[in-house]
Each structure stands twice: as C-alpha cells, then as structure tokens.
Amino acid sequence: MRTLWIMAVLQVGVEGHLMQFETLIMKVAGRSGVWYYGSYGCFCGAGGQGRPQDASDRCCFVHDCCYGKVNGCDPKKDFYTYSEENGAIVCGGDDPCKKEICECDKDAAICFRDNKDTYDNKYWFFPAKNCQEESEPC
C-alpha cells in the first residue's frame, strides 16, 4: 500500500494536494517527504496501523488523525491556499475545510522538522507485519 502512495506521487502530472504536502515538507523540514516519509514506520505512507515506532512516525499518526477529522472535502486531492510570512507558513483561503487540510499538513511538516533527530533508517520500509499492536485512539 505504501508503495502505491509513493508511485502516485512520483507519476508525472500528479495533481491534488499530496504534491502540496511534499512542497510544505521541503520548505519547513528541508527534506523530501516522499523519500523520507513515504514508507516509514507504521504510519508514514498509505494506511497506518499499530503503534508509532518513534517521534517521526508519531508525526504521521497525528497527521492521519488530523485528516480523519476533516469533513466536507478530500484531504488527499483538494488544493488549499497558503503563503509564507516571515518564514512561517500561513494557511488561508475562504474554504474552512481546505484550510483545515493545510493546517494538518503544516503541523506535520513542523513535526518532521522538530523530530529529524529521531529519524531512524531501520524504520524506512518497515514491514507492516511489525505493526500489529493495537492502535491507540486519535
């Protein structure tokens, strides 16, 4: 499943908000979301189950929970509006639902930046069979 997400993002002409998320991660965390988080731990990438393996994986868990609370638009496809002001990402636009998506993505990008030191290559392409513990609630 995670591989499908990576492939979807890497295809030429990809549209929708996943590319915006990648851009935010690059701007805020200074690294590629697709490369570093496209298939990391139990929650980064498509799907998610079990318990987060470290703080970086927890960023993805919280992001998944945030998306789960968005109603009225599609977090994986809809474009949102944001700007940069004094080095900070500011979510904008008239659509409150799309603004929520932006806030979810912004918070995840900040989380990735703040937890770079927890990133552990042993969780890159982590086997789903190691993510069988009961998930905690959002």
UniProtKB/Swiss-Prot annotation:
Disulfide bonds join 42-131, 44-60, 59-111, 65-138, 66-104, 73-97, 91-102. Residues 1-16 form the signal peptide. It is found in: Secreted. Ca(2+) binds at residues 43, 45, 47, 64. SMART domains: PA2c. It catalyses: a 1,2-diacyl-sn-glycero-3-phosphocholine + H2O = a 1-acyl-sn-glycero-3-phosphocholine + a fatty acid + H(+). Its EC number is 3.1.1.4. Pfam families: Phospholip_A2_1. It is an enzyme of class 3 (hydrolase). InterPro entries: PLipase_A2, PLipase_A2_Asp_AS, PLipase_A2_dom, PLipase_A2_dom_sf, PLipase_A2_His_AS. Gene3D superfamilies: Phospholipase A2 domain. Expressed by the venom gland. Binds 1 Ca(2+) ion. One of its GO terms (molecular function) is calcium-dependent phospholipase A2 activity. The active site is at 63, 105. Its cofactor is Ca(2+). Its main location: secreted. One of its GO terms (cellular component) is extracellular region. Keywords: Calcium, Disulfide bond, Hemostasis impairing toxin, Hydrolase, Lipid degradation, Lipid metabolism, Metal-binding, Platelet aggregation inhibiting toxin, Secreted, Signal, Toxin. GO terms for biological process: arachidonate secretion; lipid catabolic process; negative regulation of T cell proliferation; phospholipid metabolic process. Belongs to the phospholipase A2 family. Group II subfamily. D49 sub-subfamily. Snake venom phospholipase A2 (PLA2) that shows a moderate inhibition of ADP-induced human platelet aggregation when tested on platelet rich plasma. Exhibits high hydrolytic activities and prefers the anionic micelles (dPPC with deoxycholate) to the zwitterionic micelles (dPPC with Triton X-100). PLA2 catalyzes the calcium-dependent hydrolysis of the 2-acyl groups in 3-sn-phosphoglycerides. This is Acidic phospholipase A2 Ts-A1.
